[in-house]
């Protein structure tokens, strides 16, 4: 018995890139802003955006980031910039902002609740930073 479903990576890739181009056109935006963490999700997303040919800004935003993640993020950005002339990058170290925020709000004795709240805070700081770069 043969499997009639085959994975066609190039066809899927082209479909996603076309969808991104259509989305950008309909939204009347000139390009993409992608946060780069050093993980597979941001690497894939930024590569697909770069393949559109539209300006793609890769933003690294460490907050107490492991050096290995920072290195992976920088290596990915460097490789993208070599492959695609439409890729640019910025770095915004959010660690001082995060620490200032933590010092201005009450803590919690429940460590699990505190850790979740701080994880959400890191995500929102990064989101706000990406909105900033998209707006300028």
Locate predicted features.
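ATP-dependent adenylation/nucleotidyltransferase module used to activate substrates
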Residues: 2-136
């Amino acid at each position: 018995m043969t499997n009639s479903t085959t994975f066609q990576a190039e066809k899927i890739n082209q479909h996603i890139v076309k969808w991104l181009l259509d989305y950008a056109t309909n939204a009347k935006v000139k390009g993409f802003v992608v946060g780069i963490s050093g993980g597979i999700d941001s690497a894939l997303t930024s590569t697909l955006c770069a393949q559109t040919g539209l300006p793609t800004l890769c933003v690294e935003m460490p907050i107490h980031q492991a050096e290995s993640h920072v290195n992976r993020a920088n290596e990915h950005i460097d490789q993208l910039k070599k492959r695609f002339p439409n890729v640019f990058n910025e770095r915004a170290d959010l660690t001082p902002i995060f620490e200032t925020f933590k010092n201005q709000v009450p803590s919690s004795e429940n460590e699990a609740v505190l850790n979740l709240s701080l994880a959400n805070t890191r995500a929102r700081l990064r989101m706000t930073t990406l909105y900033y770069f998209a707006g300028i």
